[in-house]
Each structure stands twice: as C-alpha cells, then as structure tokens.
Amino acid sequence: DHHQSTDEPSESSKPCCDQCTCTKSIPPQCRCTDVRLNSCHSACSSCVCTFSIPAQCVCVDMKDFCYAPCKSSHDD
C-alpha cells in the first residue's frame, strides 16, 4: 500500500511550545526556547541546530504570541 501525501501536518510536528518567553512590549515579542531533537516544529521558519548527534534544535522565530503547550496529554 502506498502512502498518500497530504498537507495535514502530523500530530508530532504541530507547532507547540512548553517554554515561551515574551517581552512586556506592545505587541509582545515571544520566543520559544524549547529544545527539540533533529528538527523544529512545522511552523518554524528560523531553526537553529547544534552539530551534535542527535542535533539539538531551537526555533528562533519572534512571534507576538506563544503556541499551545506540547505536554497536554502527559499531565503529572
């Protein structure tokens, strides 16, 4: 069976952020400081990764909002 490609992002690549910091300016400037392995989330346009294996990647986009937290299904 062959996989049909769709534009729907997979659940794991949906933009989300657990550690988001914003400035107090109007509009706020928000940056996600989550570290992900090998890639950034699907909506990231500026992804910076280390050269280690696995690579540790951080999205350096500046937004005026924070994405929803990633850890929704694993509440302690």
Curated annotation (Swiss-Prot):
Pfam families per the UniProt record, alphabetical: Bowman-Birk_leg
Feature type site, description Reactive bond for trypsin: 24-25
Xref: SMART domains: BowB
Keyword field: Disulfide bond, Protease inhibitor, Serine protease inhibitor
Record's GO cellular component terms: extracellular region
Example of a GO MF term: serine-type endopeptidase inhibitor activity
Entry PTM: HGGI-I, HGGI-II and HGGI-III are produced by proteolysis of the N- and C-termini of HGI-III.
Intrachain S-S bonds: 16-70, 17-32, 20-66, 22-30, 40-47, 44-59, 49-57
Site entry (Reactive bond for chymotrypsin), positions: 51-52
Family classification: Belongs to the Bowman-Birk serine protease inhibitor family.
Assembly: HGI-III exists in a state of equilibrium between monomer, homodimer and trimer, with homodimer being the predominant form. The homodimer is stabilized by the non-covalent interaction between Lys-24 of one subunit and Asp-76 of the other subunit. The homodimer is more thermostable than the monomer. HGGI-I, HGGI-II and HGGI-III exist as monomers.
Physiological role: Inhibitors of trypsin and chymotrypsin. HGGI-III has a higher activity than HGGI-I or HGGI-II.
Protein name per UniProt: Horsegram inhibitor 1
